[in-house]
Regions:
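Short, solvent-exposed loop/beta-turn-alpha elements that line the ligand-binding surface or hinge
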Residues: 59-63, 210-223, 291-298
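Solvent-exposed, polar/charged alpha-helical surfaces in well-ordered, non-transmembrane soluble domains
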Residues: 55, 78, 82, 96, ...
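Short, glycine-/small- and polar/acidic-enriched structural segments
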Residues: 27-174, 185-191, 204-208
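Secondary-structure end/capping motifs
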Residues: 237-317
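Conserved C-terminal helix/tail region of periplasmic/extracytoplasmic solute-binding proteins
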Residues: 308-346
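N-terminal export signals
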Residues: 5-26
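Pocket-lining segment of extracytoplasmic ligand-binding domains
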Residues: 93, 176, 185-271
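Sec/Tat-exported extracytoplasmic proteins
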Residues: 61, 84, 89, 99, ...
Length: 346
């Protein structure tokens, strides 16, 4: 489903989800009333923010909702398994890696498609105008993140030898500082870091969905398979079926609300307020996120791209079918279109 099709149906979906969420809650009160989310600074958390600000989570039976920020996906994943948070909303690579190492997590849904938000940016004086000129650049990225996959896909598409690329492992804030200091020539990261670099005079070499190279500037080239997912521990889902349904119904309601163009100004203001980002920054990057919860072939393809990367890089063996650790029932009950059903059951 493309963005236009999804937004055309957003109002109907939101209304249906409101009714379904009430029906789901009628099945039984959540087993827990206190819940904590892993949180971050980018707009992917818009559904969570709206659900909290409008009191929908409290309406669903969660009387205490807290958020905890983490510097990396691994730390958030550990907190999820330890029960310190109940919902994790990472990019799709970390949970796939965790599943393949035996850590019991389950995907409950797609929060948003964020391929366009992955940006490879470079210093203007690096003069990177062609793919092969990347060999001369030190490229900052967070190793093991979705950015690693995007760089690998870029190399594959343009026929580059990935082993020759000079990757410097560093977290996003350090990437921007290092770029400004001339310690690296480029970095590949998600928002708002790419936007901040471009605002400071950097150039866009490639986004997750389009080329910035001279040879094919503006051409649609999808190097990113990044999705933001709703992830929970298997133990939480098994022990809290009502809470799981209520949580997903509320988040899906939030997705429908933030996707409705009529709510854009309100949502952007809430996101800026809660994340501490400048409103102009949120406005500039907002359209790079598509809050489409549909379970379709696109979901499977993006998850498989990540799995294939992990397998080809030797980080996992015997890649699993993404649907084997995907639980679609709560999302389906909340009104999400499920074209490919998950195979995991509590």
């Amino acid at each position: 489903m493309n963005r236009r099709e999804f937004l055309t149906n957003a109002a109907l979906t939101g209304a249906a989800t409101m009714l379904l969420s009430r029906a789901a809650m009628a099945q039984g009160a959540p087993e827990i009333t206190e819940i904590s989310f892993g949180f971050g600074l980018d707009p992917v958390f818009a559904p969570h923010i709206v659900a909290m600000q409008k009191g929908w989570l409290e309406e669903a039976g969660f009387t205490s909702v807290t958020t905890t920020s983490f510097t990396g996906g691994a730390l958030a994943g550990e907190a999820l398994i330890a029960g310190e948070i109940q919902l994790w909303t990472p990019g799709n690579l970390p949970p796939i890696s965790m599943v393949h190492t035996g850590i019991p997590v389950v995907v409950l849904g797609t929060n948003c498609i964020a391929a366009a938000a992955d940006n490879l940016v470079a210093r203007a004086d690096a003069n990177i105008n062609a793919p092969e000129e990347l060999y001369e650049a030190r490229i900052g990225l967070l190793a093991g993140s979705t950015a690693s996959v995007s760089l690998s896909q870029l190399a594959k598409h343009y026929g580059l030898d990935e082993a020759r690329l000079q990757v410097v492992n560093m977290p996003p804030p350090e990437q921007l500082a290092a770029l400004n200091a001339g310690e690296i020539e480029a970095f590949l990261c998600w928002q708002p870091w790419g936007h901040n670099a471009l605002s400071g005079g950097a150039t866009l070499v490639h986004s997750g969905t389009a080329s910035g190279f001279e040879q094919n500037r503006g051409e649609a080239v999808r190097i990113s398979a990044t999705r933001s997912l709703f992830v929970a521990s298997q133990e939480f889902v098994r022990q809290n079926p009502n809470a799981t349904r209520a949580l997903m119904a509320t988040l899906v309601r939030g997705q429908g609300y933030v996707s409705d163009p009529a709510n854009r100004s309100e949502v952007l203001a809430l996101v800026a307020q809660e994340t501490g980002q400048e409103p102009a920054v949120v406005e500039a990057i907002w359209d790079q996120y598509v809050f489409d919860p549909t379970f379709d072939d696109g979901y499977v393809a993006d998850m498989q791209t990540m799995t294939d990367y992990l397998e080809s890089s030797g980080r996992i063996s015997d890649g699993m079918d993404p649907l084997s650790y995907t639980y679609t029932d709560p999302a389906a009950e909340a009104g999400v279109t499920v074209e490919v059903a998950g195979g995991w059951q509590p």
